[in-house]
Each structure stands twice: as structure tokens, then as C-alpha cells.
Amino acid sequence: MALLFGIGYVLIIFEESLSFSKSGIALLMAVSLWVVRSIETSVEIVTLELQHATSEVSQIVFYMLGAMTIVEIIDAHQGFKLVTDCITSRKPKILLWVIGFATFFLSSVLDNLTSTIVMVSLLRRLIPPSEYRKLLGAVVVIAANAGGAWTPIGDVTTTMLWIHGHISTFSTIKNLFLPSAISLVVPLALMSLTSEVHGMGLNTPPTPLLAYDRSAPRGKLVFGVGFGALLFVPLFKSLTGLPPYMGILLGLGVIWILTDVIHYGDLERQHLKLPHALSRIDSQGALFFLGILLSMSSLDAAGILKVIANYLDAHIANVELIASIIGVVSAIIDNVPLVAATMGMYDLSTFPQDSEFWQLISFCAGTGGSMLITGSAAGVIFMSMEKVNFFWYFRKVSGFAFAGFTAGIMTYLAVHNFPL
């Protein structure tokens, strides 16, 4: 099973070179692994294991689909114009910091992918094609990953840990906000000294802001209700004790009815209604997560992940080092299966909820992907939108991202071990 998983994983890593869809590979890998598992063990046992795995995995997939649909309907109503309208500075250094922290806070309540799309689209309105715009785009990637690490709804990996009870809302925000902010501040400070930014104000005249399109009808209302629905999910979980996907489905139902009422009887606004938004969400991404998580659950059921955990415990006793290694590896390998594997390797009896280990896993897996452009969904979409290649990012940005990653870990350990 480990060999089969390894082959599938290599195919996923080189999906662009092979022109294969990683979603298709992940689904084939998941089914193949469970078939092998059924051959090794009785069908009755495997059926129970698969039912348990499907129950856990489906919660994450339902949550993702609900959140992506809400974000898509907000975007269709140009709700993010409220955010982009607030960014008016044209001074290079100020814009660098404004873009960074706007993305940081936006990503804390949205997924990294959507935050990156919104902010890179904004950059296209602010700045003509240049090295400076590429650098700002890289800032968006770092900020999106850092912003997603300190809230349960900001990144799919923190959401996975949260849904499975490894981290809680208040403790995550309290313990990871400062390290996440530091992991952004350090790269911003270093980038401010580069020639692309420092020399920009000396040699280039201010870039005029481009006009925005007029907002869709009731855009502010949809923005408020949609954002409120996303923010309500942690409160819903704490009030009812029900899993987060129920909260996101509640919000989805509310915004569905709202948009039906707003656009009732208007045939020219069908593209603003939720059924059309469902056709635009990243369903391939959801199926990829489904395949990966089912694959990891098969390895967990077979006891393979426990063997790896025992090996790490025997050779690397330091939990901080294990979490840091996972963060570095997440720059090369997708962080979703890494976190899924970690949850399978270590249960809550080994490391209880909100322990240092799970907090560090949340931080490291979230921010580690910034070190390479292919290490996160934010980096991949930036590469696609701005036609940035792997080696440009590696030369210009990876060092800054690594410095921020290291500083963030040191900040967490300092605060955790020496509380004020």
C-alpha cells in the first residue's frame, strides 16, 4: 500500500509535466488503496473502516463546497470591491505593507485561493507589468498563507485540524496570531530594502488608479450576509456542538434564499444567483481533497501511519523539530495530505487538543508552503495569473519566505515557553 501511495504521490507532484489531473490521480489512488485494503482484510472490517473514514472526510468536503460557494456568490456581486476600494496609496513601500496586511486579514476569513485571486486582480488595476508587481504578487502569496494559519476557517489545513478537534477557535487565534504576523512582517521588512521596491519611488512616476466596474445590485448586502455567514461558523459550533459543516450549510441556505429574493423574476440576473455560482466553484479541488483524505485514511486503517509515527518518535523526540520538518516538506509536497498523515500518525491521546504540537503543525503547514511557488494553492494561482516561473520565485522570494517561517516558529516558541 505504501508503494502504491508513493507512486500516486509522485504522479500528483509532476501533474503539470505529465499533463494529468491531480484530482483524477487522487481518486484513482484512493479507490486502489481501499481495494488493496479489502484484499488484505475481511470485507466486513474494511466496510466499517471505510464508513468511519467517509464520515470524517465528507465533513471537510461539505464545508469546502459550502464556503467556496458563499465566496463565489460574494465575488459575483463584486462584494470584494469594498475591500479593494480602501487601498488607494501609490507609494511603493506603503503599498507593499498595505497589500500584505490586507491579504493577511482577508485570508483569515477566506480561503487562500480566493484571497490571492482577489488581491492579484487588484494589483493588475494598480500597477503595470513589472518586477515590482511580481514582488507584490509574491507578498500576496506569503500573506495569504500566513493569514490562513491563525484562524480555523482561514486555511484548509487549519480547518481539518479544527473539524477533527485537534485545535479550538480561541486558542488558535490567541497562540498563532503573533507568529503568523511575524512570518509576514519579516519578509515585508526585507523586501522593503530590495531594489524593486526601494528604487521604485526614485525612478518611476506614481501609477494612476484604474476605475472599478459598478457594483452588482445589492452587492453590499450580499457581502455583509456572506461574510457574516463565514464568521458565524465557529460561533455556531460552540453554541450547538454540531460540526462546522452544518454551520456553513446554514449560511449557504440563507444566502441562497437571499439571492433568490433579490433577483426574483429578473432573467438578466441569473448569473448572480447561487445555481450559477455552483457551476463556477473549484469542484476539481474538492474531489482532490476527497481522494487525498480517503487515501490517507486507508493508510491509517492499515496501521502504516502509526509505524511512521513510531519511527519519528524513536529518532526525533523533539516535537518542535517534527513540526518544523513538516512545514519545510509542505513547500515541496501539498500540505493537505501532510496534515492528514500527521493526524493519522498522532491521535489526541498522544497530543491533546491545543497542545504545542498541533498548534505548530497548524502554523508550519500553513506558512511553510510559501517557500516555493508550487508549495501552496496561493502560489500556484499566482504563478498562473502573473506568468511567474518557479526559478524567479526561488531566486527573489524563497529566502524571504524562509526567514519569515523561521522567525514565526521562534516567536511561537518564545511566547509559549516564556509567557509574559
Swiss-Prot record:
Gene Ontology CC: membrane
Annotated compartments: Membrane
Highest taxon of source: Eukaryota
InterPro entries to which the protein is assigned, alphabetical: Cit_transptr-like_dom, NhaD-like
One Pfam family here: CitMHS
Keywords associated with the record: Antiport, Ion transport, Membrane, Sodium, Sodium transport, Transmembrane, Transmembrane helix, Transport
Mode of membrane association: Multi-pass membrane protein
Main location: membrane
UniProt GO molecular function: antiporter activity
Stated family: Belongs to the NhaD Na(+)/H(+) (TC 2.A.62) antiporter family.
Function according to Swiss-Prot or TrEMBL: Na(+)/H(+) antiporter that extrudes sodium in exchange for external protons.
PANTHER family: SODIUM/PROTON ANTIPORTER 1-RELATED, SODIUM_PROTON ANTIPORTER 1-RELATED
Name of the protein: Sodium/proton antiporter 2
